[in-house]
Amino acid sequence: MFTSTGSNGLYKAPLSKSLLLVPSAISILLTLLFQHYQKFFAYNLQAIKEDFQIWRLVCGRVICLDLKDTFCSSLLIYNFRIFERRYGSRKFSSFLLGAWTLSALFDLLLVEAAQYVFGITINSLPSGFLGPVFALFVPFYCSIPRVQVTQVLGYFSITNKTLVYILGLQLLTSGSYIWILALSGLISGICYNSSILKVHRILCVPSWVAKIFSWTLEPIFSSAEPTNEIRVGMGATVDIQRQQRMELLDRQIMMSQVAQMRRQRQQQGGMINWNRLFPPLRHRHNENYQDHHPSDQDTPPPTEVSEEQVARLMEMGFSRGDALEALRASNNDLNVATNFLLQH
């Protein structure tokens, strides 16, 4: 996965692990062995409205009856486990509870709106825990920094978030009316993430409930700390931990900028400089913003590089050109430049 979600695995993410294992196992059993029980997990809106089978709002919105939806939603939950590590299990479960409740309301409203505006009668929707999964795209888009990983054809950027969006698009196109679940999930995610009408205070998991689950279920779904990864020191306070996380993301962004500089240098070393013939969109945007004034005059002078640091990198076996690029991009930070050169 391209997403920067900390350590691999499900360490410090017991709720995400339970959402991966339990619904997926039930979905596989219903598909392979107990097909005659699938009717109890169908998201039948007609039965809810006409026969007042309110229990279908619960059963029909937890277990996926399509294995493709199970697979895609499981991958997305695995990527979104970063929010449980960041917020804690209680706050993460409160977000899922609020998004799940609000999306149930928006499902019914959107179905009625589709029938009133477009004349489309929708009697059933895809089953599964899909509303909260789509709702998690809201904090993912707002709070996870975009770090470039590579480029395709020199213009299409592949970032640490690209694969997650592709999975969301695959899930969106897996059913005919799943767009209603996606739209209701996004709306509920916006409402909860923006604290509209203080829903985060109303739809939350009480502390005593969180303690009960932490005593009973958390030991079952907790994962051991990865032993094959380099241990990173953790600050004693939340502010220090947040600062450490921001420093790590700054280093990732800086390294992606260095990689972009190296690719541009390789492109300019070819027979045709395609950047001069077809400038990237961000350069065109800057030119339009500056009213087509030449940008060469406003370009800041390059950062002066210490020859002593260049010599130290060359002693390690790196070329002078690579050492200069890494030091310029890292503002003469020898450690960051060395880490980048060792990884590329």
From Swiss-Prot:
UniProt cross-references to SUPFAM superfamilies, sorted A to Z: Rhomboid-like, UBA-like
Q: Under the cellular component aspect of Gene Ontology, which terms does the record hold?
A: endoplasmic reticulum membrane
Cellular compartments annotated: Endoplasmic reticulum membrane
Residue span of the signal peptide, if any? 1-34
Enumerate the UniProt keywords alphabetically.
Answer: Endoplasmic reticulum, Glycoprotein, Membrane, Signal, Transmembrane, Transmembrane helix, Wnt signaling pathway
Query: Has the keyword Nucleus been applied to this entry?
Result: no
The record's section on SMART domains has: UBA
Under Pfam families, the record lists: UBA (PF00627)
Gene3D superfamilies cross-referenced by the UniProt entry? DNA helicase RuvA subunit, C-terminal domain, Rhomboid-like
Show the PROSITE patterns listed in the entry. Answer: UBA
Every copy of the UBA domain together lies at 304-344
**Keyword hit for Thylakoid:** no
Bilayer-spanning residue ranges: 92-111, 124-142, 163-183
Give residue spans on the Cytoplasmic membrane side. Answer: 112-123, 184-344
Q: Please list where the region (Disordered) is annotated.
A: 284-307
Function noted in UniProt: Restricts trafficking of FAF2 from the endoplasmic reticulum to lipid droplets. May negatively regulate the canonical Wnt signaling pathway in the lymphocytes.
Per its record, how is this protein called by name? Answer: Ubiquitin-associated domain-containing protein 2
